[in-house]
């Protein structure tokens, strides 16, 4: 079964410096029908204006992954980490027992557009940590590239949860197979462009839950970027 989550149905807020869209309930946006999906708790699509951002704030007991679509995002945290995240880079932060961080647009002239994903950890009280990995365009082009996994397989960032996240940049007419083991579920988030899934076209910002489907194909209708979640 494929259940669509159209972009226009998400929670939407424009704070001037930040335009944000919430796939699942987050902050002031509460929808009992969309509280998360298995271990996947948050998919926020954020656009932040030049030189603006999120001041220092705290998190606990959450796996937080950031995937930048355009621009550059500057990160600082209480572990002493300072990094800039750009397209093709996966950043993960395990909040664990507590971490404080800030995120600002690294550019004074261009906006930054990114997805921030929260995944419930397998257990609480983990030691906070940070990791960041760069993936070449060739590794993402017309294939699903594992970017996050519970064991850090294939050079992906490690998640403390039985969840695997893959990314792909697809040229028009190219497709990638989707396969989920028995008892697992999938979620597709279209970051850019348009793709066909199970006879339905999904556009940028759209998402789809996949349950009880062992094999599907994801085909690009236009130049596209997608994230695919494989969830326990």
Region annotations inferred by a language model:
Residues 1-232:
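Jelly-roll (double-stranded beta-helix
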């Amino acid at each position: 079964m494929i259940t669509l989550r159209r972009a226009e149905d998400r929670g939407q807020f424009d704070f001037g410096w930040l335009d944000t869209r919430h796939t699942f309930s987050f902050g002031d946006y509460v929808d009992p029908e969309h509280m998360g999906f298995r271990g996947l708790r948050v998919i926020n699509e954020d656009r932040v204006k030049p030189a603006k951002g999120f001041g220092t704030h705290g998190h606990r007991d959450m796996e937080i992954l950031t995937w930048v679509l355009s621009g550059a995002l500057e990160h600082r945290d209480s572990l002493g980490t300072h990094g800039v995240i750009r397209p093709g880079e996966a950043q993960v932060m395990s909040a664990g027992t507590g971490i404080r961080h800030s995120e600002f647009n690294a550019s004074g002239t261009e906006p930054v557009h990114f997805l921030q994903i929260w995944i419930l950890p397998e257990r609480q009280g983990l030691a906070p940590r940070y990791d960041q990995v760069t993936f070449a365009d060739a590794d993402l082009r017309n294939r699903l590239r594992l970017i996050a996994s519970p064991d850090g397989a294939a050079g992906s960032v490690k998640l403390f949860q039985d969840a695997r996240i893959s990314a792909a940049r697809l040229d028009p007419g190219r497709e990638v197979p989707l396969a989920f083991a028995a008892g697992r579920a999938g979620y597709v988030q279209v970051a850019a462009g348009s793709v066909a899934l199970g006879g339905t076209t999904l556009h940028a910002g759209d998402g789809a839950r996949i349950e009880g489907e062992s094999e599907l194909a994801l085909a690009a209708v236009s130049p596209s970027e997608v994230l695919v979640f494989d969830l326990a």
